[in-house]
Amino acid sequence: MFVEALKRQNPALISAALSLWQQGKIAPDSWVIDVDQILENGKRLIETARLYGIELYLMTKQFGRNPWLAEKLLALGYSGIVAVDYKEARVMRRAGLPVAHQGHLVQIPCHQVADAVEQGTDVITVFTLDKAREVSAAAVKAGRIQSVLLKVYSDDDFLYPGQESGFALKVLPEIVAEIQNLPGLHLAGLTHFPCLLWDEAVGKVLPTPNLHTLIQARDQLAKSGIALEQLNAPSATSCTSLPLLAQYGVTHAEPGHALTGTIPANQQGDQPERIAMLWLSEISHHFRGDSYCYGGGYYRRGHAQHALVFTPENQKITETNLKTVDDSSIDYTLPLAGEFPVSSAVVLCFRTQIFVTRSDVVLVSGIHRGEPEIVGRYDSLGNSLGA
């Protein structure tokens, strides 16, 4: 999906990854991250958000819940980390990093609610009154006032499978009345997902029905005299979509893919954010006229299409296609069209969620000054593997 953008925006990353692989420093099934470029992308996002008065929570799941990288990005001015699930929150808190938003997309399990409250989480999203009551009880016990966001939805909204949740817009007034009667809670705002999506047909990011539902919910509460501090509208956050969010009065967004430049809008390599990572593998064997590289990093919604194959013997890079991958099977190996020498390097660049893969994450600094250096190795869940 992003091979052309990678070649256009960050050819130095390709060269550095292949060089480190030739030195035996990078193994197959590794996401190689250009630290300097991801920090530059992060800085551009912060600067753009400030222009439009939007606060940004840092999303880390796309780059493998990596605490080292998260700490560097937080230093740029992000308002804390959004933990999409409770295991991500655990990784970040163990690293001593501030989790600012928890509960969306995945609610906090009952026996972890108290810890989230006691740790000073800025906002906790709730989908049910039952969970709101758990947060209320934890807040009272801790002697705190806990801010919460309500996830809302309407019947015609778009929800990904496995993410069906929220309070129906038509019953929101009753829900809010219940929330306001719970001790220890402060209704800070509303959220939904996805609020923006890339439209391939028109070639740009557009608001979803979900965003309109979010706005309707805000306006409905405003008519009742309820002012909200936070209108949180995640999905497709980037330098070019932040102005659109500002038009709708959004106060908070949560960039993830924009940090690595792997947003659908950047398929041609023409966005302010530049590609900052690639996936490196190696030819394992041939079968019936095709080559198979080591797998582990495939993501079924990643739209991976093209690959670069590097043969050390002649220092040649050849472009080929990734053949159809059966999404119902484990990606032990991935099929590439044509036969290439065994143990040739393979480079792909596609949309990923590293935390659901088996990949290693290799952090590389100094690429653009011609001195690439590995500064960290992690697994896909943010655990250090040593330097």
From Swiss-Prot:
| S-S pairs | none
Gene3D superfamilies xref list: 2.40.37.30
Against Pfam families, the record matches this protein to: Ala_racemase_N, YhfX-like_C
Q: Write the protein's name.
A: Uncharacterized protein YhfX
This protein's species is: Escherichia coli (strain K12)
Gene that this sequence comes from: yhfX
